[in-house]
Amino acid sequence: MAKQKHIDVWIDKLTNSIENTISGESFPTVISLVTYSELKSVTKTKGWNFNWKAELKKNDHQVYKLTTRDNPKIIHGLVSLKLEEDHVFVSIIENAPFNIGKTKLYKGVPANLFAYACKVSWDLGNQGSVAFVSKTRLIEH
């Protein structure tokens, strides 16, 4: 079995914003629990890679969406968190299809979602410890 790599990262600032790649303008963000009805347009046929409805049905996971403060109906990214005894496990994290690749519209979405996972861990008394196992097939970002 291959030795697992450990990455030690310190989140020094939670910016609560994403940046438009065209204008450079920064937009304040909100991270909140997603509802089943909000996932109506989050499907593989619309360019999403994971089955978020199935993830939301897992009783031991919490699924959060990242939106902008001024436009809460547009989901920029999603993250599924599982609260463990001594850390938070990031089960799945995904950018919206329009935020992927060289033509992405906004940057900073995954960083905001990971920082939020660290905050949840910190609030639970786990010193911000977060675990994540990358998928076997990485998706172009």
Please place each PLM-identified region on the residue numbering.
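An anionic, turn-rich surface loop/hairpin at beta-sheet edges
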Residues: 108
